[in-house]
């Protein structure tokens, strides 16, 4: 969606839906998927305000839904009650004001309806409905997550640096979470090598966490890209970091786990990568010393590595498989188009 005025209204409607949703019934990713499927947050919002006057689905495809026109937050064939309608309208007006404030202060808001939204992230079921960006967006870049313990050993830090070196040599983007330890080391080495790095943060875009990485975050924003899927002032919580890990997994083509303990948050990203169909490159020490690592051995898309050369070979295999699958997909799309 490239029309600025239309996108503004779509973004306002999306924010209104998010701010008035029942979080017990509707997660943000489910709302993002509903908006993506419908192709319009405005239509969803208007359907919430008056379902009978604003149907969502084409009458030619009634099998796509049951009970006529279900509302996002619950069915109501007689339309939303007046109080609910007023709440939605007020939320939309507040969202418009918020969007103007963000724009005036230089914050870059990118929703799922924005053509700049990362394509790979659109492919995962738990895609965030929006991102705040500081830096340069690249639509279809090939990136690899390098993640691991905050309290990393010298050996693990060296492995992270060498992996970042290799990724830069291969013209791949280095993705990490700006955490202390492995993540920060991968970011720093990439910048030192003149490569591109993307940081997914577990806070709002106006915050810096941990504080010691404040300068690093600014440098990444100036030379690469910092992304946040939270409201600008969101503080770090036990929930924001797993959500950030899921987005890192969806954004990249693979995840390299350098070091992690039995209860490390890194295991969440490894699990999410498996659910997303993204390969996991697991250092042998992690596979040998953790139960969750051992459980991944032998699974499709899981590579156990000992050296950075092993990581390179795994990525060669992953990229080659991606090319074969993309070629086959293009052929199928072409064949289908010829029948239309």
Label each residue range with its predicted role:
Residues 1-10, 19-25, 105, 111-340:
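Glycine-biased, small-residue-rich flexible motifs in mid-sequence functional cores and linkers
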Residues 1-113:
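Short, small/acidic-rich helices and loops at N termini and domain boundaries
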């Amino acid at each position: 969606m490239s029309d600025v005025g239309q996108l503004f209204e779509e973004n306002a409607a999306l924010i209104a839906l998010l701010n008035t949703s029942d979080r017990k019934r509707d997660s943000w990713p489910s709302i993002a998927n509903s908006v993506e499927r419908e192709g319009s947050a405005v239509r969803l919002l208007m359907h919430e305000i008056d379902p009978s006057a604003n149907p969502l689905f084409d009458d030619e495809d009634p099998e796509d839904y049951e009970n006529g026109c279900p509302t996002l937050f619950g069915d109501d064939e007689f339309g939303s009650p007046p109080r609910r309608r007023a709440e939605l309208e007020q939320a939309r007006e507040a969202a418009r004001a918020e969007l103007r404030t963000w724009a005036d202060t230089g914050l870059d808001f990118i929703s799922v309806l924005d053509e700049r939204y990362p394509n790979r992230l659109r492919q995962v079921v738990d895609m965030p409905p929006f991102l705040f960006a500081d830096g340069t967006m690249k639509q279809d870049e090939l990136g690899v997550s390098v993640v691991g313990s905050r309290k990393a050993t010298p050996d693990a830090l060296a492995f992270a640096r060498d992996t970042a070196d290799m990724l830069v040599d291969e013209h791949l983007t280095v993705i990490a979470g700006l955490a202390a330890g492995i993540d920060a080391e991968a970011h720093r080495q990439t910048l030192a090598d003149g490569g591109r790095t993307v940081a997914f943060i577990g806070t709002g875009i106006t915050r810096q966490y941990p504080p010691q990485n404040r300068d690093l975050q600014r440098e990444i924003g100036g030379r690469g890209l910092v992304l946040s899927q939270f409201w600008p002032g969101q503080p770090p919580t036990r929930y924001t970091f797993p959500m950030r890990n899921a987005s890192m997994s969806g954004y990249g083509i693979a995840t390299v786990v350098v070091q992690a303990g039995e209860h490390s948050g890194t295991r969440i990203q490894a699990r999410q990568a498996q659910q997303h169909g993204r390969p996991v490159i697991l250092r042998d020490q992690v596979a040998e010393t953790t139960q969750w690592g051992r459980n991944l051995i032998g699974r499709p898309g899981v590579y156990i590595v000992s050296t950075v050369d092993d990581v390179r070979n795994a990525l060669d295999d992953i990229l080659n498989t991606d090319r074969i699958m993309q070629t086959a997909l293009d052929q199928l799309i072409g064949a289908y188009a010829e029948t239309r």
